[in-house]
Amino acid sequence: MNILFAGTPDPSGEILEYLASNSAYNIKGVITQPDKPQKRGNKILESSVSKISLKYNFPVFKPTNLNDPEFIKDIEDIEFDFLVVAAYGKIIPNWLLHAPGKIPVNVHYSILPSYRGASPIQASLLNGDNLSGVTFMEMSEGLDEGKIIKIFTLDIIKTHNKVSLEKDLCDLAIKNIDNVLDLLFADKILLNAQDDTKASYCSKIKKSDSVVDFVEKADVIINKYRAYSEWPGLAFIHKDVLVKIHDMHLCHEDLSGMPGTIVKFDKTGIYFKTKLGTIVITHLQLPNKNKISSADAYNAYREFFV
């Protein structure tokens, strides 16, 4: 089975690693995002997918423009059955969707048609969902609008954050990708159109999303903490200073006070009263300082927080 793979982040690399290690698949080429300069220093950052491709000596393409004539010619010279896409990061043009001998297959981390778009994992955590999943779909020109091949579901637990949920969804995708590709290759599966009337969408996460307002409900804030754990993180503004939050949890103590204010501060944490419930911050970071515990903050910055 000949495959052209497209992906960029670490979980995509795990899927590629699995396909590469399986003798049933012949990876004819890999498309990934161009290398990027590191913000600090002179190092160049290459994607996980790029590193794995080099490990297996796969032909790697890192186009800045998917419609570049030279790139198109390179792909047209490759014969492949499936284009497998896992979080590549760019819209796939129509010509590439029609390039595989069979179909283009996308691995999407939601139960489509829910959460079409760039941040389905974060969206499910932000909304406090109890269920997520992996949708294998035939790619189309529309945003995650293609026909559904198969859906596999996964329970979301309270300890899930963006990183751990993505890991579990990636494992679920790897567990089932053989079955999906085998059925498609043998033409033994019926694809189903999505119900567009039930579609919901999620946008790209922004750096500004990280700033939390403690006037919100406590469970909403906790869901943001889970969703933004990898990036952009969570922070709050106190006395015009942006303070990063590294660890927080719900307080089960019944504390009174005005929403958005610190109602208790000791070595166990900084307690913020919210619209409903109380949040305890146990690890934080002030600008240009190292990460510290609430006990250290109590000893060094007590006057700042009270």
Regions found by a protein language model. Name each.
Residues 2-4, 28-30, 59-78, 83, ...:
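Internal alpha/beta domain cores that form substrate/cofactor-binding pockets in large enzymes
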Residues 7, 30, 53, 83, ...:
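A residue-level signal for conserved active-site and pocket-lining positions in enzyme catalytic cores
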Residues 13, 43-46, 68-72, 118:
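Structural motif corresponding to alpha-helix initiation and N-cap regions
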Residues 34-54:
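N-terminal beta-loop-helix "entrance" segment that forms/cooperates
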Residues 82-201, 208:
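Donor/substrate-binding cores of folate-linked one-carbon enzymes
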Residues 203-216:
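Acyl-group handling in specialized metabolite and lipid biosynthesis
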Residues 214-306:
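An anion-binding loop in the catalytic cleft
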